[in-house]
Amino acid sequence: ASYWGFTITDGALRMLVLLHFHKLGYSPVQIAFLFLLYEFCGILTNLFGGWIGSRVGLKATLFAGLSIQAVSLVMLSFLNPEWAVALSVGYVMASQALSGIAKDLTKMSSKSAVKLLVPAEDDASKSERLLFKLVATLTGSKNALKGVGFFLGAVLLSWLGFSPALWSMAGGLLVILLVCLIYLKGDIGKSKAVSYTHLRAHETSI
């Protein structure tokens, strides 16, 4: 559910940025630059996300993804239309970099958690079919919900305006984060490796 909520806000954010800066008169190339670090930081997060998740747990990376996205939305809401174009582009690129990190942390956490939470069955093929169905549902719903997000972003921009729309989405993410904090227990996906200092203490006692 947290991944679905995040996906909607992520799609809405893309549409908000695209429409708002087109309205301000930015060129297609300038608008394209706004999303450059979003994609680049997403690639970097994909490279190291699994390693981070195994060290701190998937719950921590999920919470980090939701929190970073909320920070990105609030940061973007403080953009001043009076700033120079170069400063505005750099500022938005920085906020989109955070959003790219948040997107892949949340995606990695959600998909990995599904694999870990599938109950073990005596029939291995039954577990595999259930896992395939859940992952396919999660992945397939992404495009549909992103489309909902595009529409939501356009509606919020025309109804509330740029900054209030961003604040409302940040508030929605904080509600999702609060629900996850209450109901998600345990260290999902955290490596169970025993630390070196613990091993040394055990050897000494022997």
Regions found by a protein language model. Name each.
Residues 165-181:
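Symmetry-related core transmembrane helices of the 12-TM Major Facilitator Superfamily/SLC fold
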Residues 39-43, 47, 146-147:
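Residue-level signature of mid-helix packing/kink "hotspots" within the transmembrane helices
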Residues 95-140:
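Cytoplasmic helix-loop-helix junction between adjacent transmembrane helices
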Residues 197-204:
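Conserved small/polar residues in nucleotide/adenosyl-binding loops
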Residues 1-40:
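Helix-loop boundary and gating motifs at the non-cytosolic
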Residues 67-85:
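C-terminal ends and interior cores of transmembrane alpha-helices
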Residues 45-57:
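Helix-to-loop junctions at the C-terminal end of transmembrane segments
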